[in-house]
């Protein structure tokens, strides 16, 4: 794990992107953060301030939040913008009633709810931002948490979270259980909207907690790792996005899931007992379920991606240090989540 080098890389990638707001100077680099904030930082003592600390540390241009709550009539986006201002950081964002949120160093020209319109499970929020002469459509997603079917091969029920008598090894049965959730429907709605953005020449980014792994991480090379128990499976959301032409930033840069698994859940958190961090206490439940996707064109190129959070994970109710080639930015202090975040930096060609 190459910590110091990648902290330096992140800092260097931010050069030239410190002019914020409507009259921002065109930039050649764009850094994006996806972070599940575990019920708005309320689970871990000091969690809200820790969220602000980590956003300030990463200094991302765009931040996607999952598990926004707006407790007791408060506005999380307004609160976090004020907390970041006290740390010398200026961000823009707008309130919304969903459990996701978007921050930007650049003014947001429009924000709209994409999913659900009427009913459904999960949330997708869209914001439109102008950067370096480009229109950038950014989408923040938190998909349905129910029917967490990647637990089935590990011998746990993804709806009741109870241990089963034996694992499920049949990929078709696992996918049938997976499709009871509304994750696939949400991604289809995203694609319908993103197609219009792409047709109009916009750069499109999607960040989110999918509550579902990637098919790229569940193939022959990993079937005997991490309690996959011999299962090879093409998970729905990542497969749909791949077919549509979207690229998983982390896997684009690190195509080998054995050397760079990029696990984002369950993260260790030294402020919490292990029992609060695991849902499958006798299994290796590690997966990469937090993502940053982009639609490739000549104007956007991914140049780096890192994991934000502790370099430890929970495996069979034990705190273990990851022995991988993943690159970590470790927390400044308190870690506010049971997930790890994902950071991606892109080169943007100015218009």
What function would you assign to each model-found segment?
Residues 2-3, 7, 19-86, 97, ...:
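N-terminal, active-site-proximal structural segment of metallo-dependent hydrolase catalytic domains
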Residues 13-16:
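N-terminal signal peptide c-region/cleavage motif recognized by signal peptidases
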Residues 30-37, 51-74, 127, 138-141, ...:
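Active-site beta-strand/loop signature of hydrolases that rely on acidic residues for catalysis
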Residues 40-42, 70-74, 121-122, 146-149, ...:
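Active-site environment of divalent metal-dependent phosphoester hydrolases
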Residues 44, 68-157, 304-307:
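Structured beta-strand-rich core segments of catalytic domains in phosphoester-bond hydrolases
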Residues 115, 195-205, 210-351:
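Metal-dependent phosphoester-hydrolase catalytic domains
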Residues 136-160, 211-213, 251-259, 312-313:
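Short, solvent-exposed beta-strand-terminating loops
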Residues 151-180, 221-223:
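A solvent-exposed, charged loop/short amphipathic helix patch at secondary-structure junctions
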């Amino acid at each position: 794990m190459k910590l110091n080098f990648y902290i330096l890389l992140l800092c260097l990638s931010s050069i030239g992107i410190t002019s914020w707001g409507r009259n921002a100077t065109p930039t050649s680099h764009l850094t994006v953060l996806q972070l599940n904030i575990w019920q708005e930082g309320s689970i871990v003592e000091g969690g809200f301030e820790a969220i602000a600390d980590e956003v300030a540390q990463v200094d991302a241009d765009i931040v996607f939040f999952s598990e926004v709550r707006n407790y007791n009539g408060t506005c999380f986006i307004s609160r976090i913008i004020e907390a970041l201002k006290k740390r010398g950081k200026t961000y823009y964002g707008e309130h919304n009633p969903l459990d996701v949120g978007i921050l930007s160093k650049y003014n947001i020209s429009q924000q709209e709810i994409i999913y659900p319109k009427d009913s459904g499970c999960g949330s997708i929020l869209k914001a439109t931002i102008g950067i370096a002469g480009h229109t950038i459509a950014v989408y923040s997603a938190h998909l349905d948490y129910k029917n967490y079917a990647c637990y089935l091969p590990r011998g746990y029920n993804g709806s009741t979270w109870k241990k089963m008598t034996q694992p499920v090894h049949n990929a078709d049965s696992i996918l049938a259980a997976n499709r009871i959730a509304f994750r696939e429907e949400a991604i289809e709605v995203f694609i319908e909207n993103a197609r219009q953005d792409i047709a109009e020449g916009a750069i499109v980014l999607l960040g989110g907690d999918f509550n579902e792994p990637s098919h790229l991480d569940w193939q022959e090379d990993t079937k005997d790792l991490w309690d996959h128990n011999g299962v090879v499976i093409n998970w729905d959301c990542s497969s749909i996005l791949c077919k549509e032409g979207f690229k998983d930033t982390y896997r684009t840069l690190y195509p080998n899931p054995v050397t760079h698994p990029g696990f984002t859940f369950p993260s260790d958190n030294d402020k919490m007992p292990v029992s609060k961090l695991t849902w499958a206490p006798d299994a290796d439940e590690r997966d990469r379920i937090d993502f940053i996707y982009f639609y490739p064109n000549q104007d956007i190129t991914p140049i780096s991606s890192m994991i934000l959070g502790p370099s430890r994970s929970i495996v069979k109710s034990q705190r273990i240090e990851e022995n991988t080639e993943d690159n970590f930015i470790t927390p400044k202090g308190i870690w506010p989540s049971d997930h790890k975040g994902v950071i991606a930096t892109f080169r943007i060609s100015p218009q």
